[in-house]
Design a protein with these regions (language model features):
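Flexible, low-complexity linker/hinge segments
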Residues: 1-9, 142-147
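Short, flexible loop segments at the rims of nucleotide/cofactor-binding pockets, characterized by
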Residues: 2-5, 40-41, 88-90
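A short N-terminal helical cap/helix-turn-helix that marks the beginning
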Residues: 3-26, 43
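Active-site-adjacent beta-strand anchor residues
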Residues: 7, 66, 111-114
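Aromatic/hydrophobic pocket-lining residues that form π-stacking "cages" and hydrophobic walls in ligand
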Residues: 14, 76, 121
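Conserved AMP-binding/adenylate-forming core of the ANL superfamily
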Residues: 23-78, 95-100
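Structural core segment of the AMP-binding/adenylate-forming
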Residues: 54-55, 82-147
């Protein structure tokens, strides 16, 4: 009897589903009704993941996300964890001091920041001691990886 191999990670599951039914729906945005297929999510997370790897940060490093829920934040979270990094979604109602503690304690190397959150994150970053790079995150278009 053959033992069935199941995907062990989120990334493996997306690759598997993309290879079996690329057009199947992975995500539907309740705000925009935009649908993302398994094929699209696979292509997008591979592209984002490759850019993260090219930055030279070590796998296992923390990368924070400061964004309201959106299609882009879902794709970014999935790309981060699928590429071997630790995703740190920031609680945007926690206040600057708690965010500063979270950013410093997590040792985040980057924070992907939606425009609506930029003032809050700038305030939090100014309260902590570690160096962290901010990258723009458009809720529809995704991260600004060329910045």
């Amino acid at each position: 009897m053959t033992e069935v191999q199941f995907p062990e990670t989120i990334g493996d599951q997306i690759i598997f589903n993309s290879s079996k039914s690329a057009e199947a729906v992975w995500l539907v945005s309740p705000e925009t009704n935009q649908t993302i297929s398994f094929g699209q999510v696979h292509e997008t997370i591979m592209k984002i993941g490759q850019r993260l790897i090219e930055t030279g940060i070590e796998r296992g490093s923390s990368i924070a996300i400061a964004s309201p829920n959106s299609t882009a934040s879902c794709l970014l979270f999935t790309a981060i964890v699928s590429s071997g990094f630790v995703a740190v979604p920031l609680n945007l109602v926690a206040g600057s001091a708690i965010l500063a503690y979270t950013i410093e304690h997590s040792e985040a190397k980057f924070i992907f920041v939606a425009n609506d959150c930029r003032d809050l994150i700038n305030s939090a970053v100014s309260l902590q001691n570690s160096k962290v790079n901010l990258i723009g995150l458009d809720p529809v278009m995704g991260p600004d990886l060329d910045a």
